[in-house]
């Protein structure tokens, strides 16, 4: 099958991506909340690239361009997900490569993402794509239940 890439930029397109994004972000339970958050994130520079197989979204890569003292200008990949029946097909590598190419076109210095310590298969995938583990990501919930 031939796949095409397209950035999703409106609420209808975001709605169409909801079911696939839930494969990665299962805690996002409500489509309306998801769409509203994507609208906010796009106002902050987030872009959502979709791989289409015919009329269906079969892969997503969400990312943003940032700049800091550690990396200079860089692309940060927030989300990368491929339809479960197409995993190991090369589609994830193709999406990641397309985002990396955009980073190079934008003269970014680095290409950065995080993956969970509980996801060894994802870690192996990222190593195969040429990414290296350079640190450990720490987080703390600022909700009342996270401060106890």
Roles of regions detected by a PLM:
Residues 50, 56-65, 81:
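Conserved beta-strand in the GNAT
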Residues 1-11, 146-148:
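Conserved N-terminal entry element of GNAT/NAT acetyltransferase domains
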Residues 28-48:
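Active-site rim helix/loop that mediates acceptor-substrate recognition in acyltransferases
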Residues 93, 117-136, 140:
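Conserved active-site alpha-helix within GNAT-family acetyltransferase domains
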Residues 3, 54-60, 75:
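Glycine-rich phosphate/pyrophosphate-binding loop shared by adenosine-nucleotide-utilizing enzymes
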Residues 103-115:
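Conserved GNAT acetyl-CoA-binding A-motif
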Residues 66-77, 87, 133-134:
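A conserved beta-turn-beta hairpin within the catalytic core of GNAT-like acetyltransferases
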Residues 82, 88-101, 128:
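Conserved acetyl-CoA-binding loop-helix of GNAT-fold acetyltransferases
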């Amino acid at each position: 099958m031939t796949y095409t890439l397209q950035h999703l930029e409106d609420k209808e397109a975001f709605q169409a991506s909801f079911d696939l994004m839930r494969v990665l972000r299962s805690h996002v339970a409500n489509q309306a909340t998801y769409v509203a958050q994507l609208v906010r994130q796009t106002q902050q520079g987030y872009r959502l690239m979709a791989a289409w197989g015919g009329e269906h979204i079969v892969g997503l890569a969400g990312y943003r361009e940032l700049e800091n003292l550690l990396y200079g200008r860089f692309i940060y990949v927030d989300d990368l997900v491929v339809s479960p029946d197409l995993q190991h097909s090369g589609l994830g590598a193709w999406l990641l490569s397309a985002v990396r190419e955009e980073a190079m076109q934008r003269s970014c210095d680095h290409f950065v993402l995080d993956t969970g310590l509980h996801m060894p298969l994802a870690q192996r995938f990222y190593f195969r794509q040429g990414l290296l583990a350079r640190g450990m990501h720490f987080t703390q919930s600022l909700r009342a239940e996270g401060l106890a």
